[in-house]
Each structure stands twice: as C-alpha cells, then as structure tokens.
C-alpha cells in the first residue's frame, strides 16, 4: 500500500475516532463522569485516538525527531495541536492512574477534559483547513 493510501485510511479513521472521543467527552462532562462503562469507553477511545495520532504523525515525519520537525513547521496551529495533544495525553494518563488506584476522580481529570476540549477545537480547525483532502477521497 502506498503512503498516500495509508494516510487516507489514517485520516478517515482519525475523523471517526475524533468524533467518537468528542461525543464521549461531552457525555462524561454532562453526567459528571458517572458510571464505570462510560469512563472505560472513553479510555478505550482515547487509546485508539492516540494510536491514530501517532500513526498520522509517523506517516508524515517517519521516525525523525518529531519535536524538531514540529518546531520547523510553518503553521503554528499544527504545532499547537501537537503540544495540546501531548498535554491532554499526559493528563489523561495521570488521571487514569489516579482513578484506577484511588477509585475517585481527581482535578487532573477536569484539567484533562478542558485541555482536551481545547485540543479538539484546534483539531477541528486543523481538519477544516484540509477539507479538500476529505472531499477528494470519498472513494
């Protein structure tokens, strides 16, 4: 499979998983993170979404130093999106560890949610800027 085809599959998968993780985030926010199933679903979706983000970056940059590559980008929004993603991921891992050990929600989870919503807003802008890709790849 050609790299462009892999990127197409990855981008469409990111779009779908991004919508699902956003819906899961809104549901958790609206219900105050009640119930164990919605939290585990959000964790599973987060793992899938994160794996797809790393795959997407890999398809663009291979294994070159990603931090150096992001610093050289012309578009500051893409750089911002990368750092917001990393911050959301780190806070999500910390909140998950706290939740699984203390069986209680921590303020880290709240911060993770707020930063995550900001990241998703930037991701939506990032996607809209590249909407031609999605329009040209409906096959």
Placement of each model-derived feature along the sequence:
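Membrane-embedded alpha-helical bundles that constitute the cytochrome b-like, heme-associated redox core
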Residues: 1-139
């Amino acid at each position: 499979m050609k790299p462009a085809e892999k990127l197409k599959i990855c981008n469409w998968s990111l779009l779908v998983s991004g919508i699902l993780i956003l819906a899961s985030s809104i549901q958790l926010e609206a219900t105050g993170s009640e119930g164990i199933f919605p939290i585990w679903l959000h964790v599973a979706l987060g793992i899938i979404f994160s794996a797809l983000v790393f795959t997407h970056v890999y398809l663009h940059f291979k294994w070159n130093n990603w931090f150096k590559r992001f610093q050289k980008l012309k578009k500051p929004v893409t750089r911002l999106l990368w750092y917001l993603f990393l911050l959301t991921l780190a806070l999500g891992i910390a909140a998950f560890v706290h939740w699984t050990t203390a069986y209680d929600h921590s303020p880290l989870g709240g911060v993770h949610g707020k930063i995550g919503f900001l990241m998703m807003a930037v991701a939506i802008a990032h996607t809209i800027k590249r909407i031609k890709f999605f329009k040209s790849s409906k096959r």
